UniProtKB/Swiss-Prot annotation:
Source organism of the structure: Buchnera aphidicola subsp. Cinara cedri (strain Cc)
Gene Ontology CC: cytoplasm
Family affiliation: Belongs to the adenylate kinase family.
Subcellular location: Cytoplasm
Keyword Cytoplasm: yes
Protein name: Adenylate kinase
Length: 216
């Protein structure tokens, strides 16, 4: 099974990817985690990625396509995966669809006002990418990761000004992508309203996949 999770920043892609990975027993591929690994490799890459993300912009296609496709080829992903945060535009989707057969695309839809509320309260475990929220999904111990007990932090780009830029980028690139996906008969497109609890969103995703419900 090959599943792709798309949606605006703050829609809960990372959280739902982790939950689906456990339920279906298939590995997940996090675009954010891949970029964090790339940052560690050399200073030039680190500078470019951090500068781009902090501005709320998208990583250039040639760079992100290359590293995502390189990771997908790893042996552990041969029998399926859940990909979070890629593709983000039509060019990326076209490139990916030439390499693999995508079975499901899960689109988490949410109002932009709700996104700003979610992101401004978001907490991150830096080394793993696990996400929490001060109100909607708090850690068991305040400001500490549930698994490692390490301190949580906020992302530099999790401020209202940068969020609005990221949402503008999203509308510009990803809205046309969704229209493109809906035209592809071989891809099963599932749209879920993400302004519900994590548990309800997860149940709806699993129900739609198991019952082969699609929104086209």
């Amino acid at each position: 099974m090959r599943i792709i999770m798309i949606g605006p920043p703050g829609s809960g892609k990372g959280t739902q990817t982790q939950l689906l990975s456990k339920y279906f027993h298939i590995p997940c591929i996090s675009t954010g985690e891949i970029l964090r690994k790339e940052i560690k490799k050399n200073k030039k890459t680190k500078k470019y990625i951090k500068k781009t993300i902090n501005k709320g912009k998208l990583i250039k296609n040639s760079f992100i396509i290359k590293i995502i496709e390189k990771n997908i080829k790893k042996k552990k992903f041969f029998n399926g995966f859940i990909l979070d945060g890629f593709p983000r535009n039509i060019e990326q989707a076209k490139s990916l669809s030439k390499k693999i057969n995508i079975e499901y695309i899960i689109y988490l839809k949410i109002k932009y006002d709700d996104i700003i509320k979610r992101i401004t309260g978001r907490l991150i475990h830096a080394s793993s990418g696990r996400t929490y929220h001060k109100i909607f999904n708090p850690p068991k111990i305040k400001n500490k990761d549930d698994i490692t007990q390490e301190k949580l932090c906020s992302r530099n780009d999790d401020n209202e000004k940068t969020i609005k830029i990221r949402l503008q980028e999203y509308k510009k690139h990803t809205n046309p992508l969704i229209k493109w996906i809906k035209k592809k008969k071989k891809i099963k497109f599932i749209e879920i309203h993400a302004n519900q609890s994590i548990k309800i969103v997860n149940k709806k995703i699993i129900y739609n996949i198991n019952n082969n419900n699609i929104n086209k």
